Amino acid sequence: MRTMSRYGITRIQESRVEVPARPPPVQEAICRGPKSPCRFPFSILFSTFLYCGEAASALYMARVYQKNNDFYWMTYTIVFFLVASIMDQLTLIFVHRDLAKDKPLLLFMHLILMGPLIRCLEALIKYFEVWQKAEEEEPYVSLTRKKMFLNGQEVLLEWEVGHSVRALTMHRNAYKRMTQIQAFLGSVPQLTYQLYVSLVSPEIPLGRVLLIAFALVSVTYGATLCNMLAIQIKYDDYKVPFHAPEIICVTIWRSLEITSRLIILVLFAATLRLKALPFFLINFVIILLEPWVRFWKSGAQMPNNIEKNFSRVGTLVVLISITVLYSAINFSCWPAMQLRLADRDLVEKTQNWSHMALHYTLRLLENIAMVLVFRFLGTRVLMNYCHTFICVQLIVAYLISITFMLLFYQYLHPLRSLFSHNLADYLHCVCCPWSSRVRSENAESTPETQLNRGVV
Protein backbone atom coordinates (compact mmCIF):
# COMPACT_ATOMS: atom_id res chain seq x y z
CA MET A 1 0.00 0.00 0.00
CA ARG A 2 1.39 3.42 -0.99
CA THR A 3 0.80 6.31 1.43
CA MET A 4 1.90 9.92 1.65
CA SER A 5 3.50 11.08 4.91
CA ARG A 6 3.19 14.59 6.30
CA TYR A 7 6.71 15.33 5.09
CA GLY A 8 5.73 14.52 1.53
CA ILE A 9 7.73 11.29 1.43
CA THR A 10 6.17 8.35 -0.35
CA ARG A 11 6.36 5.20 1.79
CA ILE A 12 5.59 1.62 0.80
CA GLN A 13 4.03 -0.38 3.62
CA GLU A 14 4.13 -4.15 3.34
CA SER A 15 2.51 -4.70 6.72
CA ARG A 16 0.62 -2.84 9.39
CA VAL A 17 3.70 -2.47 11.55
CA GLU A 18 4.58 1.21 11.75
CA VAL A 19 8.32 1.95 11.59
CA PRO A 20 8.98 5.14 13.57
CA ALA A 21 11.39 7.63 12.14
CA ARG A 22 14.65 8.19 13.97
CA PRO A 23 14.48 11.13 16.35
CA PRO A 24 16.83 14.02 15.70
CA PRO A 25 20.08 13.92 17.68
CA VAL A 26 19.84 15.57 21.06
CA GLN A 27 22.70 17.69 22.29
CA GLU A 28 24.63 15.83 24.95
CA ALA A 29 24.04 17.22 28.43
CA ILE A 30 27.00 18.21 30.56
CA CYS A 31 26.95 17.40 34.27
CA ARG A 32 29.00 19.69 36.48
CA GLY A 33 30.96 17.65 38.96
CA PRO A 34 32.75 18.78 42.10
CA LYS A 35 36.28 20.08 42.06
CA SER A 36 38.92 17.47 41.38
CA PRO A 37 39.98 16.07 44.77
CA CYS A 38 43.58 16.21 45.93
CA ARG A 39 44.64 12.64 46.70
CA PHE A 40 47.71 11.60 48.65
CA PRO A 41 50.51 10.67 46.19
CA PHE A 42 50.86 7.01 47.21
CA SER A 43 52.02 5.99 43.72
CA ILE A 44 54.81 8.59 43.75
CA LEU A 45 55.97 7.45 47.18
CA PHE A 46 55.91 3.78 46.16
CA SER A 47 57.81 4.41 42.91
CA THR A 48 60.47 6.37 44.80
CA PHE A 49 60.76 3.57 47.36
CA LEU A 50 61.30 0.99 44.61
CA TYR A 51 63.86 3.21 42.88
CA CYS A 52 65.87 3.78 46.08
CA GLY A 53 65.61 0.14 47.19
CA GLU A 54 66.78 -1.25 43.87
CA ALA A 55 69.58 1.32 43.61
CA ALA A 56 70.85 0.63 47.15
CA SER A 57 70.77 -3.16 46.74
CA ALA A 58 72.45 -2.94 43.31
CA LEU A 59 75.29 -0.80 44.68
CA TYR A 60 75.66 -3.12 47.66
CA MET A 61 75.90 -6.18 45.42
CA ALA A 62 78.43 -4.40 43.20
CA ARG A 63 80.54 -3.85 46.30
CA VAL A 64 80.21 -7.53 47.25
CA TYR A 65 81.23 -8.63 43.75
CA GLN A 66 84.24 -6.31 43.90
CA LYS A 67 85.40 -7.82 47.19
CA ASN A 68 85.08 -11.31 45.72
CA ASN A 69 86.99 -10.27 42.57
CA ASP A 70 83.92 -10.96 40.40
CA PHE A 71 84.49 -7.93 38.19
CA TYR A 72 82.40 -9.39 35.36
CA TRP A 73 79.30 -9.65 37.56
CA MET A 74 80.02 -6.26 39.16
CA THR A 75 80.23 -4.52 35.77
CA TYR A 76 76.88 -5.77 34.51
CA THR A 77 75.15 -5.01 37.81
CA ILE A 78 76.35 -1.39 37.70
CA VAL A 79 75.59 -0.99 33.97
CA PHE A 80 71.97 -2.15 34.33
CA PHE A 81 71.51 0.20 37.29
CA LEU A 82 73.08 3.22 35.56
CA VAL A 83 71.22 2.86 32.25
CA ALA A 84 67.81 2.76 33.93
CA SER A 85 68.70 5.55 36.38
CA ILE A 86 69.90 7.92 33.65
CA MET A 87 66.76 7.24 31.60
CA ASP A 88 64.65 7.93 34.70
CA GLN A 89 66.27 11.34 35.17
CA LEU A 90 65.78 12.25 31.51
CA THR A 91 62.14 11.20 31.67
CA LEU A 92 61.39 13.39 34.69
CA ILE A 93 63.20 16.35 33.11
CA PHE A 94 61.36 15.88 29.81
CA VAL A 95 57.87 15.62 31.33
CA HIS A 96 58.39 18.63 33.64
CA ARG A 97 60.22 20.60 30.89
CA ASP A 98 62.94 21.69 33.29
CA LEU A 99 65.46 22.62 30.61
CA ALA A 100 63.46 25.77 29.87
CA LYS A 101 63.31 26.74 33.56
CA ASP A 102 65.88 28.24 35.90
CA LYS A 103 66.23 25.43 38.45
CA PRO A 104 69.95 24.66 38.90
CA LEU A 105 69.50 22.77 42.19
CA LEU A 106 66.91 20.46 40.65
CA LEU A 107 69.08 19.77 37.63
CA PHE A 108 72.04 19.07 39.90
CA MET A 109 69.99 16.51 41.85
CA HIS A 110 69.13 14.82 38.56
CA LEU A 111 72.80 14.89 37.62
CA ILE A 112 73.74 12.87 40.72
CA LEU A 113 70.81 10.48 40.07
CA MET A 114 68.77 11.79 43.02
CA GLY A 115 66.03 13.36 40.92
CA PRO A 116 63.20 11.00 41.98
CA LEU A 117 63.87 11.80 45.65
CA ILE A 118 63.63 15.58 45.24
CA ARG A 119 60.58 15.20 42.99
CA CYS A 120 58.90 13.06 45.63
CA LEU A 121 59.60 15.72 48.27
CA GLU A 122 58.14 18.37 45.95
CA ALA A 123 54.96 16.34 45.50
CA LEU A 124 54.59 15.74 49.25
CA ILE A 125 55.12 19.43 50.06
CA LYS A 126 52.57 20.42 47.42
CA TYR A 127 50.04 17.94 48.80
CA PHE A 128 50.39 19.16 52.40
CA GLU A 129 50.07 22.76 51.23
CA VAL A 130 46.80 21.92 49.53
CA TRP A 131 45.64 19.93 52.55
CA GLN A 132 46.25 22.86 54.89
CA LYS A 133 44.38 25.24 52.56
CA ALA A 134 41.48 22.88 51.95
CA GLU A 135 38.94 25.42 53.25
CA GLU A 136 40.17 28.20 50.98
CA GLU A 137 38.78 28.70 47.51
CA GLU A 138 41.49 28.17 44.90
CA PRO A 139 40.91 29.61 41.42
CA TYR A 140 40.83 26.92 38.78
CA VAL A 141 43.17 26.97 35.80
CA SER A 142 41.33 24.57 33.51
CA LEU A 143 38.13 22.63 32.97
CA THR A 144 38.25 18.89 32.34
CA ARG A 145 35.56 17.00 30.45
CA LYS A 146 35.37 13.23 30.53
CA LYS A 147 32.70 10.71 29.68
CA MET A 148 31.66 8.25 32.36
CA PHE A 149 29.11 5.49 32.87
CA LEU A 150 26.69 6.16 35.74
CA ASN A 151 23.98 3.55 36.36
CA GLY A 152 24.54 2.13 32.89
CA GLN A 153 24.13 5.53 31.19
CA GLU A 154 26.91 7.46 29.51
CA VAL A 155 27.18 11.02 30.82
CA LEU A 156 29.61 13.84 30.19
CA LEU A 157 31.19 15.20 33.36
CA GLU A 158 32.89 18.55 33.70
CA TRP A 159 34.88 19.67 36.72
CA GLU A 160 37.33 22.38 37.67
CA VAL A 161 41.02 21.65 38.14
CA GLY A 162 43.02 23.92 40.43
CA HIS A 163 46.67 24.82 40.06
CA SER A 164 47.85 22.58 42.92
CA VAL A 165 45.87 19.57 41.70
CA ARG A 166 47.24 20.12 38.21
CA ALA A 167 50.81 20.20 39.56
CA LEU A 168 50.26 16.93 41.46
CA THR A 169 48.75 15.37 38.34
CA MET A 170 51.87 16.30 36.38
CA HIS A 171 54.01 14.67 39.07
CA ARG A 172 51.92 11.48 38.88
CA ASN A 173 52.13 11.34 35.08
CA ALA A 174 55.91 11.80 35.21
CA TYR A 175 56.32 9.03 37.78
CA LYS A 176 54.10 6.68 35.78
CA ARG A 177 56.40 7.00 32.80
CA MET A 178 59.48 6.76 35.00
CA THR A 179 58.11 3.54 36.51
CA GLN A 180 57.74 2.01 33.03
CA ILE A 181 61.33 2.84 32.13
CA GLN A 182 62.67 1.68 35.50
CA ALA A 183 60.78 -1.61 35.24
CA PHE A 184 61.57 -2.69 31.69
CA LEU A 185 64.92 -1.02 30.96
CA GLY A 186 66.41 -1.60 34.41
CA SER A 187 64.58 -4.12 36.55
CA VAL A 188 64.00 -6.75 33.84
CA PRO A 189 67.69 -6.96 32.78
CA GLN A 190 68.80 -6.76 36.42
CA LEU A 191 66.36 -9.46 37.53
CA THR A 192 67.29 -11.75 34.65
CA TYR A 193 71.01 -11.32 35.27
CA GLN A 194 70.82 -11.82 39.05
CA LEU A 195 68.73 -14.97 38.55
CA TYR A 196 71.37 -16.25 36.14
CA VAL A 197 74.16 -15.49 38.64
CA SER A 198 72.20 -17.28 41.38
CA LEU A 199 71.85 -20.30 39.09
CA VAL A 200 75.56 -20.63 38.34
CA SER A 201 76.84 -19.47 41.74
CA PRO A 202 77.09 -21.86 44.72
CA GLU A 203 75.85 -19.28 47.26
CA ILE A 204 73.08 -16.69 47.38
CA PRO A 205 73.86 -13.71 49.65
CA LEU A 206 71.14 -11.66 51.31
CA GLY A 207 71.93 -8.60 49.20
CA ARG A 208 71.19 -10.47 45.99
CA VAL A 209 67.91 -11.74 47.44
CA LEU A 210 66.90 -8.15 48.23
CA LEU A 211 67.92 -6.99 44.75
CA ILE A 212 65.88 -9.77 43.13
CA ALA A 213 62.89 -8.94 45.35
CA PHE A 214 62.99 -5.21 44.54
CA ALA A 215 63.41 -5.91 40.82
CA LEU A 216 60.54 -8.41 40.79
CA VAL A 217 58.17 -6.00 42.56
CA SER A 218 59.26 -3.19 40.23
CA VAL A 219 58.61 -5.28 37.12
CA THR A 220 55.20 -6.47 38.34
CA TYR A 221 54.17 -2.96 39.33
CA GLY A 222 55.40 -1.55 36.03
CA ALA A 223 53.53 -4.17 34.00
CA THR A 224 50.31 -3.59 35.97
CA LEU A 225 50.68 0.14 35.46
CA CYS A 226 51.31 -0.50 31.76
CA ASN A 227 47.84 -2.02 31.44
CA MET A 228 46.20 0.92 33.21
CA LEU A 229 48.07 3.47 31.09
CA ALA A 230 47.12 1.61 27.91
CA ILE A 231 43.43 1.74 28.84
CA GLN A 232 43.65 5.45 29.70
CA ILE A 233 45.42 6.23 26.41
CA LYS A 234 43.02 4.19 24.27
CA TYR A 235 39.94 5.68 25.95
CA ASP A 236 41.20 9.21 26.49
CA ASP A 237 37.67 10.67 26.36
CA TYR A 238 36.50 8.54 29.30
CA LYS A 239 37.17 8.71 33.01
CA VAL A 240 38.32 5.15 33.69
CA PRO A 241 37.61 3.77 37.18
CA PHE A 242 39.87 1.01 38.50
CA HIS A 243 38.60 -1.17 41.33
CA ALA A 244 40.29 -3.75 43.55
CA PRO A 245 39.15 -6.93 41.65
CA GLU A 246 40.48 -5.56 38.37
CA ILE A 247 43.84 -4.54 39.86
CA ILE A 248 44.25 -7.90 41.65
CA CYS A 249 43.45 -9.82 38.45
CA VAL A 250 45.94 -7.80 36.39
CA THR A 251 48.63 -8.14 39.08
CA ILE A 252 48.27 -11.95 39.18
CA TRP A 253 48.23 -12.13 35.40
CA ARG A 254 51.35 -9.97 35.00
CA SER A 255 53.34 -11.52 37.85
CA LEU A 256 52.82 -15.06 36.52
CA GLU A 257 53.51 -14.03 32.94
CA ILE A 258 56.74 -12.16 33.66
CA THR A 259 58.08 -14.57 36.28
CA SER A 260 57.59 -17.67 34.13
CA ARG A 261 58.97 -15.91 31.05
CA LEU A 262 62.13 -14.65 32.77
CA ILE A 263 62.85 -17.96 34.50
CA ILE A 264 62.54 -19.75 31.16
CA LEU A 265 64.96 -17.25 29.61
CA VAL A 266 67.43 -17.79 32.46
CA LEU A 267 67.28 -21.59 32.20
CA PHE A 268 67.69 -21.38 28.42
CA ALA A 269 70.71 -19.05 28.79
CA ALA A 270 72.26 -21.26 31.49
CA THR A 271 71.89 -24.27 29.21
CA LEU A 272 73.39 -22.82 26.02
CA ARG A 273 75.57 -20.09 27.58
CA LEU A 274 76.94 -17.85 24.79
CA LYS A 275 75.10 -19.82 22.12
CA ALA A 276 71.82 -18.37 23.44
CA LEU A 277 72.96 -14.78 22.81
CA PRO A 278 72.19 -14.76 19.03
CA PHE A 279 68.65 -15.96 19.75
CA PHE A 280 68.05 -13.13 22.22
CA LEU A 281 69.57 -10.50 19.93
CA ILE A 282 67.62 -11.60 16.85
CA ASN A 283 64.39 -11.71 18.86
CA PHE A 284 64.93 -8.21 20.27
CA VAL A 285 66.04 -6.70 16.93
CA ILE A 286 62.93 -8.05 15.17
CA ILE A 287 60.69 -6.48 17.82
CA LEU A 288 62.69 -3.23 17.61
CA LEU A 289 62.55 -2.88 13.82
CA GLU A 290 58.96 -4.04 13.30
CA PRO A 291 57.32 -0.62 14.03
CA TRP A 292 59.84 1.17 11.80
CA VAL A 293 59.32 -1.28 8.91
CA ARG A 294 55.56 -0.73 9.15
CA PHE A 295 56.15 3.03 9.27
CA TRP A 296 58.39 2.87 6.19
CA LYS A 297 55.87 0.76 4.25
CA SER A 298 53.01 3.16 5.07
CA GLY A 299 54.84 6.06 3.41
CA ALA A 300 53.80 8.44 6.19
CA GLN A 301 55.83 11.39 7.38
CA MET A 302 57.47 11.65 10.77
CA PRO A 303 55.01 12.98 13.38
CA ASN A 304 55.72 16.54 14.49
CA ASN A 305 53.31 16.84 17.43
CA ILE A 306 55.49 15.24 20.10
CA GLU A 307 56.94 18.54 21.32
CA LYS A 308 56.58 21.88 19.56
CA ASN A 309 60.13 22.99 20.45
CA PHE A 310 61.76 19.82 19.08
CA SER A 311 63.67 19.66 15.84
CA ARG A 312 63.49 16.66 13.56
CA VAL A 313 66.57 15.21 15.26
CA GLY A 314 64.98 15.62 18.70
CA THR A 315 61.76 14.02 17.48
CA LEU A 316 63.74 11.12 16.02
CA VAL A 317 65.58 10.60 19.34
CA VAL A 318 62.28 10.54 21.25
CA LEU A 319 60.76 8.06 18.78
CA ILE A 320 63.79 5.79 19.04
CA SER A 321 63.56 5.90 22.85
CA ILE A 322 59.86 5.03 22.73
CA THR A 323 60.61 2.16 20.35
CA VAL A 324 63.35 0.78 22.62
CA LEU A 325 60.98 0.90 25.62
CA TYR A 326 58.22 -0.77 23.57
CA SER A 327 60.63 -3.52 22.48
CA ALA A 328 61.79 -4.11 26.05
CA ILE A 329 58.18 -4.49 27.20
CA ASN A 330 57.32 -6.74 24.27
CA PHE A 331 60.32 -8.97 24.93
CA SER A 332 59.24 -9.83 28.49
CA CYS A 333 55.43 -9.52 28.38
CA TRP A 334 52.53 -8.28 26.29
CA PRO A 335 52.82 -4.47 25.79
CA ALA A 336 49.01 -3.89 26.12
CA MET A 337 49.04 -1.67 23.00
CA GLN A 338 50.54 -1.67 19.54
CA LEU A 339 53.02 1.03 18.55
CA ARG A 340 52.05 2.92 15.37
CA LEU A 341 54.68 5.48 14.37
CA ALA A 342 52.57 6.62 11.41
CA ASP A 343 49.62 7.62 13.63
CA ARG A 344 49.37 10.94 15.38
CA ASP A 345 48.90 9.32 18.80
CA LEU A 346 51.76 6.82 18.15
CA VAL A 347 49.56 3.92 19.34
CA GLU A 348 46.64 1.98 17.93
CA LYS A 349 43.57 2.96 19.92
CA THR A 350 41.28 0.19 18.68
CA GLN A 351 41.10 -3.10 20.57
CA ASN A 352 43.16 -5.43 18.38
CA TRP A 353 42.38 -9.01 19.44
CA SER A 354 44.47 -10.43 16.57
CA HIS A 355 47.61 -8.70 17.83
CA MET A 356 47.07 -10.08 21.32
CA ALA A 357 46.40 -13.61 20.05
CA LEU A 358 49.46 -13.55 17.78
CA HIS A 359 51.71 -12.30 20.59
CA TYR A 360 50.67 -14.95 23.11
CA THR A 361 50.77 -17.73 20.51
CA LEU A 362 54.33 -16.88 19.49
CA ARG A 363 55.49 -16.41 23.08
CA LEU A 364 53.95 -19.73 24.13
CA LEU A 365 55.71 -21.54 21.29
CA GLU A 366 58.97 -19.79 22.18
CA ASN A 367 58.66 -20.77 25.83
CA ILE A 368 57.90 -24.39 24.96
CA ALA A 369 60.93 -24.55 22.65
CA MET A 370 63.23 -23.05 25.31
CA VAL A 371 62.06 -25.37 28.09
CA LEU A 372 62.54 -28.34 25.76
CA VAL A 373 66.12 -27.21 25.16
CA PHE A 374 66.61 -27.02 28.93
CA ARG A 375 64.95 -30.41 29.42
CA PHE A 376 67.14 -32.31 26.97
CA LEU A 377 70.40 -30.31 26.98
CA GLY A 378 70.56 -28.79 30.46
CA THR A 379 72.16 -31.75 32.18
CA ARG A 380 74.56 -29.55 34.17
CA VAL A 381 71.92 -27.05 35.32
CA LEU A 382 69.96 -27.80 38.52
CA MET A 383 71.29 -31.36 38.66
CA ASN A 384 69.49 -32.18 41.93
CA TYR A 385 66.03 -31.25 40.58
CA CYS A 386 63.58 -32.91 38.21
CA HIS A 387 63.82 -31.03 34.92
CA THR A 388 60.53 -32.37 33.62
CA PHE A 389 58.65 -31.13 36.68
CA ILE A 390 60.25 -27.67 36.37
CA CYS A 391 59.33 -27.43 32.68
CA VAL A 392 55.72 -28.43 33.32
CA GLN A 393 55.44 -25.93 36.17
CA LEU A 394 56.72 -23.06 34.05
CA ILE A 395 54.42 -23.78 31.10
CA VAL A 396 51.42 -24.22 33.42
CA ALA A 397 52.24 -20.90 35.13
CA TYR A 398 52.31 -19.16 31.74
CA LEU A 399 48.99 -20.75 30.75
CA ILE A 400 47.45 -19.64 34.06
CA SER A 401 48.58 -16.09 33.33
CA ILE A 402 46.81 -16.29 29.95
CA THR A 403 43.69 -17.50 31.77
CA PHE A 404 43.74 -14.45 34.05
CA MET A 405 44.23 -12.26 30.99
CA LEU A 406 41.13 -13.77 29.37
CA LEU A 407 39.21 -13.32 32.61
CA PHE A 408 40.14 -9.64 32.78
CA TYR A 409 39.15 -8.77 29.21
CA GLN A 410 35.95 -10.81 29.27
CA TYR A 411 34.53 -9.81 32.67
CA LEU A 412 36.65 -7.21 34.53
CA HIS A 413 37.70 -4.63 31.94
CA PRO A 414 36.39 -1.25 33.20
CA LEU A 415 35.11 -0.22 29.74
CA ARG A 416 34.20 -3.59 28.27
CA SER A 417 30.76 -2.21 27.30
CA LEU A 418 32.51 -0.17 24.58
CA PHE A 419 33.87 -3.27 22.83
CA SER A 420 32.15 -3.85 19.49
CA HIS A 421 33.17 -7.51 19.85
CA ASN A 422 34.39 -9.01 23.08
CA LEU A 423 36.99 -11.72 23.54
CA ALA A 424 34.44 -14.55 23.50
CA ASP A 425 33.17 -13.39 20.09
CA TYR A 426 36.71 -13.35 18.69
CA LEU A 427 37.52 -16.83 20.01
CA HIS A 428 34.21 -18.14 18.69
CA CYS A 429 34.94 -16.60 15.29
CA VAL A 430 38.43 -18.12 15.15
CA CYS A 431 37.55 -21.56 16.50
CA CYS A 432 34.13 -21.98 14.84
CA PRO A 433 34.04 -19.89 11.65
CA TRP A 434 31.20 -21.98 10.15
CA SER A 435 28.85 -21.44 13.08
CA SER A 436 29.72 -17.71 13.15
CA ARG A 437 28.79 -17.42 9.46
CA VAL A 438 25.50 -19.24 10.04
CA ARG A 439 24.72 -16.99 13.01
CA SER A 440 25.34 -13.85 10.95
CA GLU A 441 23.11 -15.19 8.15
CA ASN A 442 20.36 -15.93 10.65
CA ALA A 443 20.68 -12.41 12.03
CA GLU A 444 20.26 -10.98 8.53
CA SER A 445 17.09 -13.04 7.92
CA THR A 446 15.20 -11.84 11.02
CA PRO A 447 11.74 -10.22 10.54
CA GLU A 448 13.06 -6.84 11.69
CA THR A 449 15.79 -6.92 9.06
CA GLN A 450 13.35 -7.90 6.32
CA LEU A 451 10.95 -5.16 7.39
CA ASN A 452 13.67 -2.53 7.27
CA ARG A 453 14.63 -3.71 3.79
CA GLY A 454 11.03 -3.37 2.66
CA VAL A 455 10.82 0.27 3.73
CA VAL A 456 11.79 2.76 1.00
Swiss-Prot record:
The chain crosses the membrane at residues 40-60, 75-95, 105-125, 209-229, 276-293, 316-336, 356-378, 389-409. InterPro entries: XK-rel (IPR018629), XK-related_adapter (IPR051773). Its main location: membrane. It is a multi-pass membrane protein. GO terms for cellular component: plasma membrane. Keywords: Membrane, Transmembrane, Transmembrane helix. The keyword Transmembrane helix applies. Signal peptide: none annotated. Coiled coil: none annotated. It is found in: Membrane. The keyword Thylakoid does not apply. Belongs to the XK family. This is XK-related protein 2. It comes from Sminthopsis macroura (Stripe-faced dunnart). The gene is XKRX.
